[in-house]
UniProtKB/Swiss-Prot annotation:
Signal peptide: none
Residues covered by the Radical SAM core domain: 96-313
Cell compartments where the protein resides: Cytoplasm
Annotated SUPFAM superfamilies: Radical SAM enzymes
Species annotation: Pseudomonas putida (strain W619)
Positions bound to [4Fe-4S] cluster 2: C110, C114, C117
Protein name from the UniProt record: Lipoyl synthase
Residues covered by region (Disordered): 1-24
Gene designation: lipA
Transmembrane segments: none
Length: 338
């Protein structure tokens, strides 16, 4: 079990007070990634010499399938983005080969610059007013039964993008009335009340927002975000729409301790969160936050056991688990009637 004393020193190499070049000017529509992206956060990330070698339980075989190409072509046809591609998800091959995808709306440029994430940062373009209809058509073409919709952060919008989520849900249900929808939303920083009022009018079947990491690591891992704000967002939605299950997740391997993970899980239950995902953080590039540890599958299994003891309806906990990975199975196993 990892202690705080063991975890804290490991974070020191990621911070440096030495001068650094001025970050590149951000132009509208230009996507910054890697070193250009993390250069704009308060805590300097020192590039690692090389990416860490993954243990055997982390390695993924990339299946070769025409279905992968078909879905990619369909996304391009409808001018859509998948978080599977943008965030370099290790499960992309499996999900695409199975004919499913998690759709990322509101563009592929995020106004945040979290150094664990591989999605590009910058000044996004205006919303595509045709995206809700295009998304609905694509989902109908794929004949999907369970769909996850997520987004980049859009701090440039007065409602944080909540109305665009609602428009997408409305269009999808019009063309595919039997589809079940899970939304993985941003934190709506400074816009919680207006965003939740809109969301409550057109709620999804599962409302998901990730805490991502333990509060001690927020400054380094989630600059611009607030741990308690995210918990409140999930609880307030549950109070407004009590019949819709809520869900959240954590990445492990950023320097947290097992005790801190358990404490966050308790806080989640105190805020009426129903479903939990726990997965291993994988460093997207040398310029991102380094992996501090690879959590053993047995430890993930232990977290799942503890989660069920706390009252979570479902816990998906494993090295390759991601928030939207097998989300349909998770909802089904939780026996949630959608």
């Amino acid at each position: 079990m990892t202690t705080v004393q063991e975890a804290v020193p490991n974070l020191i190499p990621t911070q440096d007070a030495t001068p650094r070049p001025a970050p590149k000017k951000v132009e509208a529509g230009v996507k910054l990634r890697g070193a250009d992206k993390v250069a704009r956060i308060p805590v300097k990330i020192i590039p690692t010499d090389e990416l860490p070698k993954k243990p055997d339980w982390i390695r993924v075989r990339i299946p070769v399938s025409p279905e992968v190409d078909r879905i990619k072509q369909l996304l391009r046809k409808h001018k859509l983005h998948s978080v599977c591609e943008e965030a370099s998800c290790p499960n992309l091959g499996e999900c695409f080969s199975g004919g499913t995808a998690t759709f990322m709306i509101m563009g592929d440029i995020c106004t945040r610059r979290c150094p664990f994430c591989d999605v590009g940062h910058g000044r996004p373009k205006p919303l595509d007013v045709d995206e809700p209809k295009n998304l609905a058509v694509a989902i109908a073409d794929l004949r999907l039964k369970y769909v996850v919709i997520t987004s980049v952060d859009r701090d440039d919008l007065r409602d944080g993008g909540a109305q665009h989520f609602a428009d997408c849900i409305r269009e999808i249900r019009a063309l595919s009335p039997g589809v079940q929808l899970e939304t993985l939303v941003p934190d709506y920083r400074g816009r919680m009340d207006v965003a939740l009022e809109i969301t409550a009018q057109e709620p999804p079947d599962v409302f998901n927002h990730n805490l991502e990491t333990v509060p001690r690591l927020y400054k380094a891992a989630r600059p611009g975000s607030d741990y308690d704000w995210s918990l409140d967002l999930l609880q307030k939605f549950k109070q407004m729409v009590p019949h819709v299950p809520t869900k959240s997740g954590l990445m492990l391997g950023l320097g947290e301790t097992d005790e801190e993970v358990i404490e966050v899980m308790h806080r989640m239950r105190e805020h009426d969160i129903d479903m939990l995902t726990l997965g291993q953080y994988l460093q997207p590039s040398r310029s991102h936050l380094p992996v501090q540890r690879f959590v053993h599958p047995d430890t993930f299994a232990w977290f799942a056991e503890e989660g069920y003891k706390m009252g979570f309806k479902n816990v998906a906990s494993g090295p390759l688990v991601r928030s939207s990975y097998h989300a349909d199975q998770q909802a089904h196993e939780a026996k949630i009637k959608l």
